[in-house]
Amino acid sequence: NGAFVQKFRYGYTPCCMRIDRYLRYDAPNTLQVAIRGTNLPNSRWYSGQGIYRDAWILTGDYLHVAPDGLHVTTLDCDRELAVLEVKAELQNEGQRSREGYVKLTVHDGSGREVAGRKARFYVDSNGRVTVRQRIDLEKPALWNVDTPNLYSVDCQVIDRETEQAVDTAQTTFGIRKLQLDSVHGLRINGQSVKLKGGCVHHDNGLLG
């Protein structure tokens, strides 16, 4: 709508900015993202410029999972048991404190629910809090190069006052144990794996 919002100087990492204060809620809005690199060359050769990745408009409650704020870490795993840590970073951009609980649900590749946990939280106004939960998963389908089994975890943020979900987030993950040393090289779930690949960028191929 003609108002300057924010400048971001490095194009190879994501950025996130609030635009609600610049919106007109009773009329059409115009959102313009300008890419300007002519005054600051970024390569030793001529390369293309523009937006190469997805751009999203996020809407929701003042209390929400922060962008890219849901992560799963495999603490330990074998064919009998996987020990996972799910970390959800909650952000409260409102002017009052909030509390409630986070509901975590793990699904396997077929969509079947295989585990779940709940964890309470309290977050100050204009604050952040990280909720961590350990989840034990029996008989996991491990991820490897030949059978890249995947799971997903759904995160619901439940407000204490209304008992309603004010935000949801989901991420996909694989369960595997990585080891790297000078004797065996890279091992995935105890099996040696040879690294094969190339550095091919999105622009200018091998020179990108």
Label the model's feature ranges.
Residues N1, Q6-R9, C16-R18, Y62-T73, ...:
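Active-site-adjacent substrate/metal-binding segments within catalytic domains
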